[in-house]
Amino acid sequence: MLMLFHKSAGQNITVRVNSVNDKKEKVVYATTAILRNTDSSLIFTQTSNKETVFLLKNNTAYILKITAVNIKTFYQKLFTGSNDTTINVVLQTVSKQLGEVVVNSRTPLLKQEDDKTVVDAEQLAGSSTNAFEVLEKTPGAIVDQDGNVYLNSSTPSTIYISGREIKLSAQDLANLLKNLPANSISKIEILRNPSAKYDAASSGGIINIVLKKGVKLGVNGSVDVSHFQGVYGSEAIGFNVSNSKEKLNTYLSYNFSKKLNGEDLSSNRYTNTGGLFKQYAFTRFNNTNNYVGGGINYDVNKKLNIAYDVRISATQNNSDVNNNISISSLRTGNILGKNISIVNNEGPSLYVGNGVAVKYKLDTLGSEWSNTLDYTYFRSNSNQDYSNVNIFPARNTLLGDGNILNNKNILAYKSDVVLKTKKKFTIEIGTKLTYSLSKNNSVYFSDTSTGKYVDRLQTNRFRYTENIAATYLQIAKTFGGFTIKPGVRLEYTDIKGRQLIPADTTFAIKRTDLFPYIFIRHKIAKIFGFSLVGNAIYRRSITRPFYESLNPYQRYADQYTYDIGNPRLQPQFTTNYELNVNADEFPVFSIGLNDIKNIFTTLTYSRGDTLFRTYDNLGTNKEIYMRAVIGIPPGKKYFFYAVTQMNIMNYKGQYDGVPFTFHKSSFTFFLFQNYKPTKTLTLSLNSFMRVNTVINFFELKPYGGISFSGNKSILNKKMNVILTVNDILRTNKNSFVINQPNFVADGYRFYDNRRIGIALKYNFGLKPRAEKRQGFEIPQEIN
């Protein structure tokens, strides 16, 4: 224990730490950390080749921790006295060869950090081919087949990639995630109740997919090859590489993938006139994608850091739909009509996201000023051909084609200042400006016996701009076992939309809203060695109508189904209240209420023989949720965690102009198990089940899935062979029922989810030596 001399209470002193190895050589890139003596939680950390300097409170007990490659982790009690001091540490060298890793560590799979849950995505990536599948296996995240991801409520969450919001439709976002390689993800951060620092338009919470970047350990990387086979197959090949010098860190990743998949959709729709519409549609998807990600990170000096990163995803999309429809009388059973609709869509899409980040350290207390400027570009160009063959009664075949062009440009600037005072106040203040421009141009033609003509019903040109200016302030202070963090966010919204074709129509939304936030933490007790901490959260948020939900043009699905936006859609507001308990940074239990007003969602309206899928405001929903997490801390060979969540929904409002109430309780179960029979073999089993699920008022019958993964290290742990089986029992199928005013239907929807796959991963260069950690953690293979 290091004893320093007493000076006077309530002041800070400077502590300098120098470290060398047992050969008296300077340790390269040593990470020096200051931990709390009471619970070993992290206070400060620095990685440097030189002397590290900390400003610490005098007459206080801490823990000093130092880690580095090929160095045994160093721990020592530290008690600050009254005078500045310098600590010289000799670290013990551990003999290793380049490219080898001794796996004697435990990497946390699931842990709580303040107001966010952090999931180690690398544990899930081994049994996944893309980011979408990783999200499906993420504990507490509920993914529907349209690509929406849910956390606490019936409102979809907002998706971020490396801290940048992805402003795409659910379908475009799902396509982007399905083309993002699973092995490019480092971790997933789940913010169920984001603070005032984050955009208020995140009523459903935030999921931040953090991509891998280079680490300061010289040259290292991996090469990956995989093939998955179900009814259809998919394959991918790619690499990740990073290179670091003393101040410069660069990284690059590339992935090529080709995916084939199929979807079965069967539905029965019952009309008010006693008719039955039976529909069976099969869709075959064939997509190829090239993904490139890279970045550069430069330490100008000890205080200033500049970084640039870019992500490019280029996809060739192809789909073929074969839709069989029959119309009959429920009373007599007579066939009234029968036809086949064939639709082909093909075309490229391009996503480019890039940004510059500048971070400046203001002092040694941890204060900093960060600025980011991001530009996102998305373009899709789809050509569609369709034909409607009327079998009974026999009529002329209807032929048509169209071109759908979408362009999005998003520019965002954000500035954040974090001030940490000597009296242990943390003050955060910042601003964000976002400009978004979206353009849609759809041109359709109908082929008739007399020629080819413009289809004025489907042809559309639409322009949409969105300007959002925001500023926030929040303050955090810990005293007497309590941490209190109140905050407030002010946002100004200016939205304009103009349809030029088929008719010149405009709409505009201008509004200013205030969003308060309160976070209170209190240490409850210590039971069986676990420190229990309770949190209370209050938050107000908004869900704004987005471009696709407002665009009034009719998009053709088949001759009986159209997708159409609603330019009269109004924002939805959510007030959230939550109490939760954590045990040693592990989430244990949560209970909360989402009070949602002016709710809007996807709805299906029936107009005679035609269905319109649109968006509309319904009324209110008071949703109660409860979530519990249990697990066995990892021993030498076995670990598991289980998550149970219950949602109780109470809707009240109008559906298609008819008053309605809707009450439903749904349950979700997750289970992850990991078994390590040898030092080089890890087996994992991931399963989930959902009961009484409701999505956009479609009530789903119980469904779920079981996935297995085996990970074997070979070639002195330089290569991993991963065998995966997804949806073993083929139970991940949605059977649905909807019974609402003017719309009654049932059916099922099924993807080619059951797949067996093999992946090879070769690791090269210098890898970080993992550390031994405590709590709810899982053994990790080399990655």
Predicted regions and their residues:
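N-terminal periplasmic accessory domains that precede
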Residues: D84-V90, A131-V134, L173-L176, I190, ...
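Surface-exposed extracellular loop regions of Gram-negative outer-membrane beta-barrel proteins
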Residues: V210-V223, N261-R269, K278-Q279, N287-G295, D494-K496, I527-N576, I591-D609, I728-P741, ...
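Outer membrane beta-barrel strand-and-loop segments of large Gram-negative receptors
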Residues: Y280, I410-K414, D455-N460, Q570, ...
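Short, acidic, small-residue-rich periplasmic hinge/interaction motif at the N-terminus
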Residues: K23, T31-L35, K65-I71, T86-A125, ...
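Outer-membrane beta-barrel signature, preferentially recognizing the C-terminal barrel domain
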Residues: N406, N460-E466, I542-D595, R613-I624, ...
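Face-selective signature of the C-terminal outer-membrane beta-barrel domain
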Residues: Y291-T315, V343-R498, A525-S531, F586-I591, ...
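Short acidic/polar hinge/loop motifs at secondary-structure boundaries
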Residues: L55, A131, K137, R164-R192
